[in-house]
């Protein structure tokens, strides 16, 4: 399986790239900074240097062509202003969806955010803008003719993954290791039955395979 991952140098993406490469898949990470290429190669991924904030659908389509799936795991990151929440967390996610649609790549997995729809549209606070950007991106992806899955994790931590989560359409506030989010992304890619589903996920007690299976019963 060839999987193109936007935000290829993010911590979730690097976990996912290692997991995919370990089982013989071909992860292709899109990065903005050429200095990050070596890190992706060390993780077993191919790297493509492309700035999604300043790219066209045609340019992204060149990277996506021939992929079995795309994953959006990019983000403006801590310390960025409101403007980049819109250009990265919203616009780049939509750009990847348009490129996937243009090239016939139907499988789109989106890393969104817990509580993305519960934001204050009148608030200038950066976090509220971030949630609004994620919500808008999710809505745009749902509106496209793609086999999408939208994953909304809680607060992200760098602790080792436990392989156990609480996963549902809506869950209470909580945190989750980035490694577990990557495991969910990997497993979702193997489950066409999760297409058309949006869910929240935090740390919990249910093994990830069982939690994902509960979505489709």
Q: Which sequence ranges carry the predicted segments?
A:
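N-terminal Rossmann NAD(P)H-binding glycine-rich loop of SDR-like oxidoreductase domains
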Residues: 1-25
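Substrate-positioning beta->alpha
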Residues: 93, 133, 172-187, 197
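Glycine/proline-rich active-site loop of Rossmann-fold NAD(P)-dependent oxidoreductases
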Residues: 120, 160-165, 188-197
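Non-catalytic, hydrophobic alpha-helical segments
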Residues: 70, 151, 181-185, 201
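Flexible, glycine-rich beta-alpha linker
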Residues: 118, 143, 149-169, 201
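Short-chain dehydrogenase/reductase
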Residues: 198-206
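NAD(P)H-binding glycine-rich loop region in Rossmannoid oxidoreductase-like domains
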Residues: 29-95, 99-102, 190-193
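Conserved Rossmann-fold NAD(P)-dependent oxidoreductase catalytic core, especially the SDR/UDP-sugar
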Residues: 6, 26-28, 34-36, 76-143, ...
């Amino acid at each position: 399986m060839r999987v193109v991952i936007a935000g290829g140098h993010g911590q979730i993406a690097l976990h996912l790239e290692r997991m995919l490469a370990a089982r013989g898949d071909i992860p292709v990470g899109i990065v903005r900074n050429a200095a990050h290429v070596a890190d992706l190669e060390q993780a077993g991924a191919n790297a493509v240097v492309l700035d999604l904030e300043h790219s066209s659908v045609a340019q992204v389509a060149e990277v996506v062509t021939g992929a079995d799936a795309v994953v959006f795991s990019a983000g403006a990151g801590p310390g960025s202003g409101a403007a980049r929440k819109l250009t990265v967390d919203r616009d780049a996610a939509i750009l990847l969806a348009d490129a996937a649609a243009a090239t016939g790549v139907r499988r789109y997995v989106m890393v969104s955010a817990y509580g993305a729809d519960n934001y204050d549209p009148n608030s200038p606070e950066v976090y509220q803008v971030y949630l609004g950007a994620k919500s808008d991106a999710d809505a745009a992806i749902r509106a496209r003719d793609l086999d999408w899955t939208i994953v909304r994790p809680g607060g992200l931590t760098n602790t080792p993954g436990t392989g156990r989560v609480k996963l549902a359409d809506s869950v209470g506030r909580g945190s989750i290791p980035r490694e577990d989010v990557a495991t969910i992304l990997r497993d979702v890619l193997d489950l066409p039955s999760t297409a058309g589903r949006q869910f929240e996920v935090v740390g919990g007690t249910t093994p990830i395979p069982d939690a994902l299976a509960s979505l489709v019963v």
